[in-house]
Amino acid sequence: MASSLRAAISKIKRDDVGQQVCPNYVMLRSSVTTKVVRNVVEYQIRTGGFFSCLAMLRPLQYAKRERLLGQRNLERISTRDILQTRDLHSLCMPTPDAPMSNHQAATMRELICSYFKVDHTDGLKYIPMDERYSPSSLARLFTMGMAGLHITTEPSYKRVPIMHLAADLDCMTLALPYMITLDGDTVVPVAPTLSAEQLLDDGLKGLACMDISYGCEVDASNRSAGDQSMDSSRCINELYCEETAEAICVLKTCLVLNCMQFKLEMDDLAHNATELDKIQMMIPFSERVFRMASSFATIDAQCFRFCVMMKDKNLKIDMRETMRLWTRSALDDSVVTSSLSISLDRGRWVAADATDARLLVFPIRV
């Protein structure tokens, strides 16, 4: 992994708008193209294979990756076989996958310092004032991205979206990950939504305002997706205790911050609607939306379970079997093209891969 990653990093180049490009490393953007038709913005996002990069989540590989990038020494992590609380803090740190502007860095830092009552020195630990860094870190993939999201057409390993995220353009309202049921062709939510303020007022002390669930396999052991979904939600909640509270709250915090950043970016689009046909405005916005759109990568239920399981609560993960499922995927080294359409009208947002609709997101007000 270390040698292949080093080879991938050596291939990094910059495209015509100064963004880092590496076709074989999914954490580095490949390309984004934009088309504006009336008030609908359509994005074509091409990324490398996702599954081959999940191996980096293993502490040993993650430590190698961090040392290779010269960010910090994580040798102690490599001696353990499960992620600890402080590892989640590392996962939430920005990574140099897509640069952000100083204005974006300052905005994110202000959000952190204001809402979580920390001084600017601590804020610098999370959002460095450096254009090499981006809020699009592993945390974004494992918060927004773990919300179900894609149904893959791979017949040997299908997933169902059992929850979704939405951010209303008119108010700071989040539809957090929640389980859904299908009534014919209609997606019916089975849990309420909460505002970001309500989440942050929770004091980050637990799951009182947030019930975490995640995706599941279809027809695993001949059990319905709904039954698996309920079991998944229970598993996460059972992980909560005094020892795991901080780590779970880190995930919760990142979810709130990612959604708040998404809201700011959507506001920026709404306030500049009359300028959408000007390519000068669309280029920088495309880069920001790419970081949000990367959350639509296919993700695995076992991956999230692995991330949040700080202590062994008799929920054992067969990592050998898990990695076998990941590595056998035909998507390992292929280029995946996804589409994201955002309309300024009231209605639904659709994320699709090729011609198949994979996720329907409905802007909601509480």
UniProtKB/Swiss-Prot annotation:
Keywords: Host cytoplasm, RNA-binding
Subcellular location: Host cytoplasm
Provenance organism: Reovirus type 1 (strain Lang)
Protein name: Protein sigma-NS
Primary site of residence: host cell
Entry superkingdom: Viruses
UniProt subunit comment: Homooligomer; in presence of RNA. Interacts with protein mu-NS; this interaction allows the localization of sigma-NS to the viral factories. Interacts with host G3BP1 (via C-terminus); this interaction induces the relocalization of G3BP1 and other SG proteins to the viral factories periphery.
Pfam families: PolyG_pol (PF01518)
